[in-house]
């Protein structure tokens, strides 16, 4: 019962981090772009 109440309160506690969670799926794309820019900088050796 106590753990169920804790889980119910969790979304409210993490409401502050919602913008960060919205950005998280985009991070792998930035790594892909970083790898491409890095390879372009060294001339695709």
Curated annotation (Swiss-Prot):
It is a single-pass membrane protein. One of its GO terms (cellular component) is chloroplast thylakoid membrane. Pfam families: PsbK. The chain crosses the membrane at residues 23-43. SUPFAM superfamilies: Photosystem II reaction center protein K, PsbK. Its main location: plastid. Residues 1-8 form a propeptide. InterPro entries: PSII_PsbK, PSII_PsbK_sf. It is found in: Plastid, Chloroplast thylakoid membrane. It comes from the Eukaryota. GO terms for biological process: photosynthesis. Keywords: Chloroplast, Membrane, Photosynthesis, Photosystem II, Plastid, Reaction center, Thylakoid, Transmembrane, Transmembrane helix. One of the components of the core complex of photosystem II (PSII). PSII is a light-driven water:plastoquinone oxidoreductase that uses light energy to abstract electrons from H(2)O, generating O(2) and a proton gradient subsequently used for ATP formation. It consists of a core antenna complex that captures photons, and an electron transfer chain that converts photonic excitation into a charge separation. Belongs to the PsbK family. PSII is composed of 1 copy each of membrane proteins PsbA, PsbB, PsbC, PsbD, PsbE, PsbF, PsbH, PsbI, PsbJ, PsbK, PsbL, PsbM, PsbT, PsbX, PsbY, PsbZ, Psb30/Ycf12, at least 3 peripheral proteins of the oxygen-evolving complex and a large number of cofactors. It forms dimeric complexes. This is Photosystem II reaction center protein K.
